[in-house]
């Protein structure tokens, strides 16, 4: 098992914790991470892009002028895709981009993302991350003391923590249940409270 230092909010080491190898020491495969991140981003798409086809555009269906004898190029009705204001050919219509990858693959990708943070020395474990009041300055001071700017911070549900951090750039606070591959990889650092380790074990083992 890997051993990591547990720090307080002043950046001082107060104890150590063991991390299970089955979660924090697995083979990292970029193809698996890519597939899960691609799925997450696809699920976030609104899929509301919409265009009007020839049958949707308002206008007469009458032929503009006779087929032959005018010397001009032949024309159909005003809704022709060739004309300004006409319909769009093969344009987008509202649809869902949602798809899923197997649950085992999603769990494996999460383990890989956590492993990569540990190996890159960008995983910080804190004894607790709580504040007595909602104060952005206090949160920024704690993050700087931990050397974890540009970080994904895992919360144990503390409202003061979430509200103190919501206006800080390049920082995101997530509850442990919302831990996901995309956000772990997006931010340089990952800050975990000690209690979250057991919750992650329960979710992934």
Curated annotation (Swiss-Prot):
Q: Where is this region: Disordered?
A: 43-77
Give residue spans, biased composition: Basic residues.
63-73
Record GO cellular component, one term: ribonucleoprotein complex
Alphabetized UniProt keyword annotations = Ribonucleoprotein, Ribosomal protein, RNA-binding, rRNA-binding
GO MF terms, alphabetically ordered: rRNA binding; structural constituent of ribosome
GO BP terms: namely:
translation
Pfam families documented for this protein: Ribosomal_L4
Q: Which cysteines are joined by disulfide bonds?
A: none
| Alphabetized InterPro entries for the sequence | Ribosomal_uL4, Ribosomal_uL4-like, Ribosomal_uL4_dom_sf
Keyword rRNA-binding tagged:
yes
Q: Which family does it belong to?
A: Belongs to the universal ribosomal protein uL4 family.
Q: What does this protein do?
A: One of the primary rRNA binding proteins, this protein initially binds near the 5'-end of the 23S rRNA. It is important during the early stages of 50S assembly. It makes multiple contacts with different domains of the 23S rRNA in the assembled 50S subunit and ribosome. Forms part of the polypeptide exit tunnel.
User: How does it associate, per the subunit comment?
Assistant: Part of the 50S ribosomal subunit.
Name of the featured protein = Large ribosomal subunit protein uL4
| Organism the protein comes from | Desulfosudis oleivorans (strain DSM 6200 / JCM 39069 / Hxd3) (Desulfococcus oleovorans)
**Classification of source organism:** Bacteria, Pseudomonadati, Thermodesulfobacteriota, Desulfobacteria, Desulfobacterales
